[in-house]
C-alpha cells in the first residue's frame, strides 16, 4: 500500500496544519460554527475542497486554518444550519459510532488534542492521493460547524457537537466546519474515508460521497485518515446528499466532533468517558452493522456494551480501506473504532452513528491492518446495513472490553515512525504507547476521527481515567505499515481513558439509530452518499447526554454519600450544669474541707498600738519625763509686763515737767472762736442792710401772654383808681411812668447784686 504518511504539523488551532503531503489546504476556509448559515454555505462551499491531484480533497487544511479554540458560541451553536438539514442528516448517520468500534477507532478513547486533531486528524490518503482532512480541527465552536461539515459531507451523519465537538472543535471545529462548508466534498470524502476505515470498504466505493456516518467516520476518519490515506475521492458528495435533516443536537451532543475527527476535534472528557464506557471494543462488524443500520434505517440506540475482541471484520475491506487510510486497525476496526467512539458519542451525545456504508470505498489495493480498538460506536447499521444496533452495541462492548484488555494504553504516545507529527503525541491523552505493531499515527488518525466522539466520551465518562480506547497502535504490523504510510502520529489519544459507561450506551444507541437512518446510503463503505438524513431532533438528546456525562460518578457519589448522623444516645445523656440533678454537685476537683483550726497565738506578738502594748516601752531605753518647777526668782519680766510697771527705760530717767502756760496772754483765738465773737474783720465794721426786694413789682414776664398784671402798690394811697395800678402792657414792659417807685427799686436791686457779685 502506498501510504505516504503525511507529516502533519499539528497546530492545535490549525487544522490546516495537518499539512498532509497529499492534502492541499483548500482555500483558507474557516467555517464559523457560530453561523448556522455557514453550515449550508460551508457545506455548499465544499467546492473549496479541491481534490488533490490524488483526488483527495483536504477540507482539513482549511479546517486547520479555521481551527480555533472552541468558543461558547461554537459549542452552543447548532452544528448544522437547519438550512442544511439534508446535508446534516446525510452527514449525521456516520456520526453514530457502532458499538463494535473501539474507542480509538471511534476516536473516543483518543481525545485528540488540538495538536493531535490538527496533525492526527488529517490523514493523507496517499493511495487515494487525497488527503482527507479527517482532522478538520473542530473548533469547539457551535456544533453547527460540525454539522456544516457533516452537511457538506452528505454521507457524513451530522453528529451533534455537544461534548465531543466541544472537545474537538477546539482543534478546529469551526474551521473544520468552514472547510466543511467549503470542502464539504472533502469532508465527506474524508469522512467517507474515515468511515471506510471504520467500515473497512473505503467510502470511495461510495462514489466520493460521504458515508452517512461521516461524522462518526470523521472521528474515525480522523484516526483512519490520519493513519491511512483514504482512497475515497474527496467527499464532495453534496452536503445534503443524504438529505438528512441536520442532526445538530445529535452532532453537538456526540460524535460530531467525530466528524471533525478528521479535524481532530478532542472529545469532551465526559463524552470520552461515556464513549469509553460504551466503547467496549466491539467487533468491527458492530460498527459496520451500526453504520449500515444508521444508513438504512434510523439507528437504534441499543447500548450493549459487550467487550469482544476486535474481530477484523471486513478485514479485506479493512485492509484495503486501511491501506488507503493507512489505518492501523482493520477498516472494520477503524470504522469500529470510530464507531465505538462515535457510537459512544452517539450514546453519550445521541450522535447519529456514521453509517458504515462509506467503508465501501475501503476496498483498495492497500491492505488494511486492523488495530483492535474499543468500539464505542452505538449499534450502527453494519456495512451490510443488516447488523442491528443492539448487536453492534454488544459487539462493540465486548470488543471494547477485550480491546481494553489488549490495549492497556490506547493513546500511542510515541508518534508512529511514519508519522512526522510530533505534536500529535503530546495531545494524546493515553500515556501507554501502543504496541509497535499498530502505527500510532493510525491511532492518532482514528483518534482524531473518532476523537470527537472519543473526546466527548472521555469528557462525559467519569471513567475517563480508564484507558479504554482501543489502542490504535495495537493494530497488526501490517496496519502499522499502513499507518506509517499515513504520517499522522497516533498522538491523538487513541484510547478513551474513561471506560465505556454501561449507562451511556443507550444514549449512544439512540444516536447511532439517528446516524443510521441518516446514513442508509453507504452502510458498508464510506460512500460519499450520506446516510439517510437523521432527524435533527435527536441532536438535542445527544447534547443533553453529552453534557450530563461530564460529571464524574465519583463526584456525584461524593455529593450523594453524606454520612448519616447517628441518633444521639439519650440514655447516656447527662444533665447539664445547673439542672436539678446537679443540685448536690460540688464543682471542682473534689470535696474541699474547710477545717477551722484555732491558731496558737501564744507565740504571736501583738502589733504596736494594740492593747497588749499599753505598757510597752519603745526600744532605745525608757525615757522619763521629770517635772521640775522653774525657779522664777531670777527671772525678770519682759518689757510691758506687770512686773515692769515701774520700769524706767534705760538711758536715764526722763522727767516730764508740766508748765502751765498763760495762753490768754500770749495767744489769740482763731477766727470764729468764742473769743472772737466780737471780732470785726479788717476793713472796719460793715453793716449788712437787708433790703426787701419787690420783684413782683419789677418782674416782667418774658413771654407776653397778654395778661395784664394789676399790681397795687402798697405804697400807693388808698386810692383805688385804676391808673394807680401798674399796667403791664401786652409787651410786658412796665410803664415806669405809672410806677416811679419801680425805677428806684430796680436801681437798688442792681446795686445790691453788684455788691454781692451777682
Swiss-Prot record:
Residues where Phosphothreonine is found: 69, 71, 111, 470, 486, 492, 498, 522, 529, 534, 548, 720, 744
Biased composition annotated in UniProt, kind: Pro residues: 491-503
UniProt region (Microtubule-binding domain), positions on chain: 561-685
UniProt keyword annotations, A-Z: Acetylation, Alzheimer disease, Cell membrane, Cell projection, Cytoplasm, Cytoskeleton, Disease variant, Disulfide bond, Glycation, Glycoprotein, Isopeptide bond, Membrane, Methylation, Microtubule, Neurodegeneration, Parkinsonism, Phosphoprotein, Repeat, Secreted, Ubl conjugation
Effect annotated for changing residue 5 to L: In PSNP1; delays assembly initiation and lowers the mass of microtubules formed; but the assembly rate is increased compared to normal tau
Biased composition (Acidic residues): 217-228
Domain of life: Eukaryota
Tissue expression notes: Expressed in neurons. Isoform PNS-tau is expressed in the peripheral nervous system while the others are expressed in the central nervous system.
Main location: cytoplasm
Residues with PTM Omega-N-methylarginine: 472, 666
Modified-residue entries (Phosphotyrosine), positions: 18, 29, 514, 711
GO biological process, one term: cell-cell signaling
PTM sites of type N6-methyllysine: 576
Basic and acidic residues compositional bias, start-end: 1-26, 179-189, 207-216, 314-323, 344-356, 381-393, 455-466
Pfam family membership, one: Tubulin-binding
Reported impact of residue 706 to R: In PIDB; in vitro the mutation reduces the ability of tau to promote microtubule assembly by 25 to 30%
Modifications after synthesis and translation: Phosphorylation at serine and threonine residues in S-P or T-P motifs by proline-directed protein kinases (PDPK1, CDK1, CDK5, GSK3, MAPK) (only 2-3 sites per protein in interphase, seven-fold increase in mitosis, and in the form associated with paired helical filaments (PHF-tau)), and at serine residues in K-X-G-S motifs by MAP/microtubule affinity-regulating kinase (MARK1, MARK2, MARK3 or MARK4), causing detachment from microtubules, and their disassembly. Phosphorylation decreases with age.
Residue ranges with Polar residues bias: 61-71, 718-733
Residue ranges of the region described as Disordered: 1-573, 715-734
Extent of the Tau/MAP repeats: 561-591, 592-622, 623-653, 654-685
Protein name per the record: Microtubule-associated protein tau
Provenance organism: Homo sapiens
Gene that this polypeptide is encoded by: MAPT
